[in-house]
Amino acid sequence: MAGDFYDYARIFVQAGDGGDGAATFRREKYVPRGGPDGGDGGRGGHIYLVADPGLNTLLPFRERTRFVAERGGNGGRSRKHGRNGRDVFIRVPVGTVARTIIDGETYTVDLDAPGLQLLAARGGRGGLGNVHFATSSYQVPRIAELGEPGERREIELELKLLADVGLVGFPNAGKSTLLSVISAARPKIAPYPFTTLQPNLGVVEVGDYSFVVADIPGLIEGAHRGVGLGFSFLRHIERTRLLIHIIDAAGVDGRDPVGDFHAINEELRLYQPELAQRPQIVALNKADLPEAQANLSRLRHALPLPDHDVFVISAATREGVDALLQRVAGRLKEMPAPHRVPRDETLTWPVPDVDERQYTIERTSDGWRVRGRKIERLISMTNFAQPDAIMRIQRVLEASGISAALQEAGIQNGDTVYIEKAAFEWEDGEITYLMPGVR
């Protein structure tokens, strides 16, 4: 990976509001009393997240964090339908996990295959024109709906690299050097800790078999709590099928190779217990140094792994590297392959289905609060400047049982009823709209 690497971002998305319906009537030369002909508003633009295999970082979201889709067009005369707002497509790397909070619950969608789309925010429905409200007893409907507001969401994006093999170990153990000799990747390499400050990917070919290796920046004790480079990089190990645990067998700078092995595995366990059970192959690196040769016998006996999963290598001279790769390829072939084929599929937030007709009534210090998806949507799409708007709301409150429920709860004349952002005064079962600021 070249350039800066960002694997976390927060964005705000705002889908387009629906267009307003029209409250118009036919005006034709020989039709003196033409009926309603107001058209519907267009749908607001949706906002999608799209998994793009050509991206490998969330860097673009460092500069741009807000995305707004277009509003739907208004309806017009002669039943003219407003045009739909243009959709917005936000491209993210394959392997991006999206999270949002809806009604107090956190929902997660994993964009782990090329082409997957997430409908991140749904555009509002266009308002109905007055042609929909005409009946035999109500032939001159002076009402049309406003467009429904588009969904607004704060979304957390987290990139988890898609790699078959993860290179783990303490800083300066030789992970980047190994990646550079087994693949075409060219990570920054220097003889001091924390040279690698971002994950690097490389494709390794063993005969006619290939796999992807991720060089994870060096871990230290306390990484599961965010110490050092911390859990911001541990997340990239989660999707790997196999770990190559690289140990500095020479014990440079007085390090204990056996202690390092156990310390790294403990960090993996504390971060995510399943990671400690992930298949591992150990590479005892720096075998070209005399100090390593003196430690090899002790290390082989101290490591709780079979001999066929412990390899003595020198990434600097390539000693033992080919044998290591053959073993890695063999282990991967024995494991189930991940299903990452392109998928032309649109996902939605996994929100449970609910009956939108349900509602709740709460007694508050200054009145009554009615909540419910259907009734709140009706209020948000009501143009209170239109003469017949209150009449429609009154009918819906009665038909839905809300009026009866309020009376059963003990509402009194003069009490205020709040629904969504609107306030109404209750009087003998009928409501009067209170302009904002009026009590």
From Swiss-Prot:
Any one Gene Ontology cellular component term annotated for this protein: cytoplasm
Q: Which domain of life is it from?
A: Bacteria
Q: Give one Pfam hit by family name.
A: GTP1_OBG
Q: Cite a single GO BP annotation.
A: ribosome biogenesis
What are the names of the required cofactors?
Answer: Mg(2+)
One MF term in GO for this entry?
Answer: GTP binding
The protein's name: GTPase Obg
Source organism of this protein record: Roseiflexus sp. (strain RS-1)
Gene name?
Answer: obg
